[in-house]
């Protein structure tokens, strides 16, 4: 779990410290290690919004246990804005809605990183054990 947290922290810090022209976020995300898919989403509040899939080991102590894909939603308003991270305790499907905006993100005009919890919805390892 700590390894996953460290990876996610590094991932999000990398996203926010890279200075790039608008529209380059998708390329920057795709260049990060472990990213297995990016899909652009529609949003009423974020100029750029993506579903990012991160491939991780099921058990960091046992690489033979395989991997799973964790779903993360990234809403981007600017490199000069703060970032809110939501570590949802369940599924993240509601964050896919174009009208969704986290309350703090709205108040601070902040970027959003919304992490779906492992073993929920699309972030479920196969087989579950």
Residue ranges and their predicted role:
Residues 1-24:
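Bacterial Sec-dependent N-terminal signal peptides
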Residues 123-129:
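Catalytic nucleophile-loop/oxyanion-hole region of alpha/beta-hydrolase
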Residues 9, 37-40, 116:
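Residue-level signal for secondary-structure boundary elements
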Residues 9, 95-96, 123:
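Active-site-proximal flexible loops/turns
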Residues 105-123:
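Conserved alpha/beta-hydrolase
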Residues 20-110:
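Catalytic-loop region of hydrolases
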């Amino acid at each position: 779990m700590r390894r996953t947290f460290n990876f996610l922290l590094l991932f999000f810090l990398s996203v926010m410290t890279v200075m790039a022209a608008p529209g380059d976020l998708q390329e920057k995300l795709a260049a990060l290690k472990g990213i297995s898919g990016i899909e652009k989403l529609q949003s009423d509040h974020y100029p750029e919004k993506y579903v990012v899939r991160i491939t991780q080991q099921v058990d960091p102590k046992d690489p033979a246990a395989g991997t799973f894909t964790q779903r993360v939603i990234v809403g981007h308003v600017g490199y000069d804005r703060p970032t809110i991270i939501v570590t949802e305790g369940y599924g993240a499907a509601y964050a896919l809605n174009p009208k969704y905006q986290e309350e703090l993100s709205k108040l601070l005009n902040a970027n959003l990183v919304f992490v779906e919890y492992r073993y929920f919805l699309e972030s479920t390892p196969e087989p579950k054990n």
